[in-house]
């Protein structure tokens, strides 16, 4: 499975901060907690390709989330529920993570895998996402693992050819269907969203009559879980055609 996508260049980053203690015990405890977080962040080494590894154009981070169906979720509780798995900067580092992860088809309940560029959280409200949107495809059960792998390999290999527009991808496992989506920065750029749609059709080998949804994150924030004005109704769950003699 090596060399399934072309490596380009790496992009690493780090952050740091400093804090001071206050005189009161209560404020001191708060500052200590914040200081510990910042010290941990500053000590975290930037993720870079190893010797002889094939660097990616961007660093990416895997995330995982799971929640109880039917329970209302605020943006704060949603953020707390997202768990970061790890960040990688090369083809080899990706496979080290991916080869040990459960495949989407084997997940149970209301679970999601997210793969986003480093520094972008898989949330509508993130600065990189707030003016963007996502293409959505609903799948019959049993197809998520293959489609997810094809999607993220295409994303890591820069097959969408839209510059920095791609933010990340999500696979959502539900009880009666699975959903994959790819997020971009600028929902108003129709040429870019159309190119993403066409590339998505190609890398997933979708039938020509497959109906896809595009939903802006602004619409998602206003009406979570509902059909919005810029969302196209997806009437038939896609399944591959079988060539039967």
Curated annotation (Swiss-Prot):
The keyword DNA damage does not apply. Residues 1-52 are annotated as: Disordered. GO terms for molecular function: mRNA cap binding; RNA 7-methylguanosine cap binding; RNA binding; RNA cap binding; translation factor activity, RNA binding; translation initiation factor activity; ubiquitin protein ligase binding. This is Eukaryotic translation initiation factor 4E type 2. Changing residue 125 to A: Ability to bind capped mRNA reduced to less than 10% of wild-type. GO terms for biological process: miRNA-mediated gene silencing by inhibition of translation; negative regulation of translation; negative regulation of translational initiation; negative regulation of type I interferon-mediated signaling pathway; rescue of stalled ribosome; translational initiation. It comes from Homo sapiens. Changing residue 124 to F: Ability to bind capped mRNA reduced to 13% of wild-type. It is found in: Cytoplasm; Cytoplasm, P-body. Interacts with EIF4EBP1, EIF4EBP2 and EIF4EBP3. Does not interact with eIF4G (EIF4G1, EIF4G2 or EIF4G3). Component of the 4EHP-GYF2 complex, at least composed of EIF4E2, GIGYF2 and ZNF598. Interacts with GIGYF2 (via the 4EHP-binding motif); the interaction is direct. Interacts with EIF4ENIF1/4E-T (via YXXXXLphi motif); increasing affinity for the 7-methylguanosine-containing mRNA cap. Changing residue 183 to F: Unable to bind capped mRNA. The keyword Protein biosynthesis applies. Changing residue 135 to A: Unable to bind capped mRNA. Its main location: cytoplasm. Transmembrane segments: none annotated. Changing residue 148 to A: Unable to bind capped mRNA.
